[in-house]
Amino acid sequence: MSCYTAILKSVGGLALFQVANGAIDLCRHFFMYFCEQKLRPNSFWFVVVRAIASMIMYLVLGIALLYISEQDDKKNTNNANTNNDSNSNNSNNDKRNESSINSNSSPK
């Protein structure tokens, strides 16, 4: 992997993380607005509900990022295996061609 590819993947990953972080903040603002209307902002239950909601949102984000990275790793592994298989098939075909050429060129 070239350096440029690694940098682009890193920047792309950070950008996706920022988008996910913005989505979580937006959900938190909507959720906090709802809780402030129904619960007092300084009550114990408000703090507990807010903490649980934050943990669930970050858990979903972590699982999603883990799933994306595993899919990317599987895709890279499959591409590497496909390339190795095609290279070995080409070398086998070359060996067959050599043997047929050698058998045809033998003196009779």
UniProtKB/Swiss-Prot annotation:
List residues in topological domain: Virion surface: 67-83
Per the UniProt record, which residue ranges are transmembrane? Answer: 46-66
Q: Which GO terms describe its cellular component?
A: host cell cytoplasm; membrane; viral envelope; virion membrane
Q: Which residues lie on this side of the membrane: Intravirion?
A: 23-45
**Region: Disordered, residue numbers:** 76-108
Q: How does it sit in the membrane?
A: Single-pass membrane protein
Q: According to its UniProt record, where is this protein mainly located?
A: virion
Instruction: Please report what switches on or represses expression of this protein.
Output: Expressed in the late phase of the viral replicative cycle.
> Could you say which protein family the record assigns here?
Belongs to the oerthopoxvirus OPG135 family.
Report the protein name in the record: Virion membrane protein OPG135
Give the lineage. Viruses, Varidnaviria, Bamfordvirae, Nucleocytoviricota, Pokkesviricetes
Gene name, Swiss-Prot/TrEMBL:
OPG135
